[in-house]
Amino acid sequence: MQDFLQLTLSGGQPEQKEGRNGLLRWRWLNVGILELTPLHSVPRALVVSSGIHGNETAPVEIVEQLVNALLRGELALQARLLVIYGNPAALRLNRRYVHGDMNRMFGGRWQQYEDCPEARRAWILEQAMDNFWQAGDYEEVRWHLDLHTAIRGSYHAQFGVLPQRMTPWPEDFMHWLASAGLEALVFHRATGGTFTNYSSRHFQAASCTLELGTALPFGHNDLTQFAAVRLALRQLIAGGENIPAAAQPRRYRVSQQITRRSDRFVLHMSDEVLNFTAFPQGTLLAEDGEDRVYVQQAREYVLFPNPNVATGLRAGLMLVEDNVHNKAL
């Protein structure tokens, strides 16, 4: 087929909507949504998404290389694969989003937004994921990797955020995340509106949001910084063994959320504060009218601080180290 990324950015449709090479069949399902299926039976179904935020281009470029290699027959495919470029309209504009943050709209939350292109797109992506996994065998292993970059710099340059899960995480999934070069893993303890929360909660997929560096425009990313995750993705898609991790990721869990509830909200952090900056117990983190948010534990670490979110949305997460796991590293 034509270049999938360029086709997505143009908003066009391919002349042929399905085809095959010697290793796989492909189907163009919608703008930015491509299904690739091996010509033989496989036990795994994998969703790889990127571009949910339109200014986070490095993951899109990483996925583009994989898709091109698959379509040219240069890379074997050992999983059913659904590739998603999440927000084509925002990607064209190099903006985080056009009207609203799509990664707060999944799990049906898109119904709360009227006349919002991101809400309509979230519904389309939910349907595509539903159809993809329903088409597979009930026993197949389901993984969802949602690739992002962070707005701010970070003490952990690359890290993963895992949604709430009621059952233990599969060991092979944890090993893969380590082999991808992630320096830290953050575990949510509550449900939310992210794409990975949707895939985990509704389809019992092993899901992770991978935060890979900082947001830059197309053509300005140094993809050599992501050598570990690029190799890990190739190995996963081609059915190879995990590359041994250089080090095990540090583990954190969410201790509290900072939410902007009114126009009087003030976040007591500078724009230069990095993700995973530590604050001691008793530190005033935010004010919102008469409400105050303080560090509750002996030490908490901030993640995704953003005072400019819309009212009602998350303005930051506070984390504590998961010492039970970290002592075993």
UniProtKB/Swiss-Prot annotation:
InterPro entries: AspA/AstE_fam, AstE_AspA_cat, Aste_AspA_hybrid_dom, SuccinylGlu_desuccinylase. Its EC number is 3.5.1.96. One of its GO terms (molecular function) is succinylglutamate desuccinylase activity. Pfam families: AstE_AspA_cat, AstE_AspA_hybrid. The active site is at E211. Keywords: Arginine metabolism, Hydrolase, Metal-binding, Zinc. The keyword Secreted does not apply. Belongs to the AspA/AstE family. Succinylglutamate desuccinylase subfamily. This is Succinylglutamate desuccinylase. It comes from Erwinia tasmaniensis (strain DSM 17950 / CFBP 7177 / CIP 109463 / NCPPB 4357 / Et1/99).
